[in-house]
Amino acid sequence: MSSLQCLKKVHLEIHRKDLQVFSSDTERAFAIGHEVGDMAIRLYGQGRGVEVQYDSGLARALMTTEELMASGAQEPIFEATLEHEGVLVREDVLLSVDSGSDWRIVEVKASTKVKPEHVLDCAIQAWVHRGAGHDFESISLAHIDNQFRYRGDGNYDGLLVENDLTEAVQKELPTVPHWVEEAKEAVEGPMPDIPVGAHCTKPYKCPFMGYCWPNDTDYPISGLGGSRKKLGLLVMNGHEDIRDVPPSEISGAGHERIHRVTRAGESE
């Protein structure tokens, strides 16, 4: 998914992971995601099912998944690990249909609705699933029902609601090989020259922003706040410090005020 946000990002994830800095909001989102994932195991498993462990290494996780699927497992498989053409996925919930002759894939998100990036994520999972030699009957996204009310006694039934994305995913599948090829080229070749912009925070805040955005100055452009697209254009025009930006390139009352105050060196 990283490559769909920014090819430079996926290159850095492989070659310069040391440059990553996760914001407190991102760390909190990770924690919530893990909690929702644990709840999905509880809700879909109902005390049953097998979670594929990753602490014994990738090879073992892949082997365990294949063994479980080959056995026609009737119980849910959690974190099923599959690989195809160098692309690795871990399926949150994998449910057997017709004693393992077909499968139902469920991706779980700590969101309250289906977002465009979720469809792309599911498309990649479906492509790997099929490429690894397995068919699927359907692929769905389970997200939090924002109308859910907890009534006590540890009963969270109804917390997650499923949306069938099979049709939307099928439309994206022909494009997945192109995405994969682009990602491989970005990883194996020199770092892509991608300018900063709105994609730095959408759909997720990039942990490499501190590296890509100019910050070796007293008043970096990011200090203007607001639209990353507008700030990215200023950086593309060669500006690193707020004080160096000509007034003609500043728009919007908020940016104009910050620009004036910063250049004047005193508050208004």
Predicted features, each with a name:
Residues 1-101, 220, 226-266:
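Metal-dependent nuclease catalytic cores that hydrolyze phosphodiester bonds in DNA/RNA
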Residues 57-153:
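Well-ordered mid-protein domain cores that form the structural environment of catalytic cofactors
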Residues 35, 39, 124, 175-182, ...:
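Long, highly charged amphipathic alpha-helices
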Residues 113-116, 128-209, 215:
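Metal-dependent nuclease catalytic regions and adjoining charged, substrate-binding loops involved
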Residues 34, 116-119, 123, 225-228:
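Conserved structured core elements
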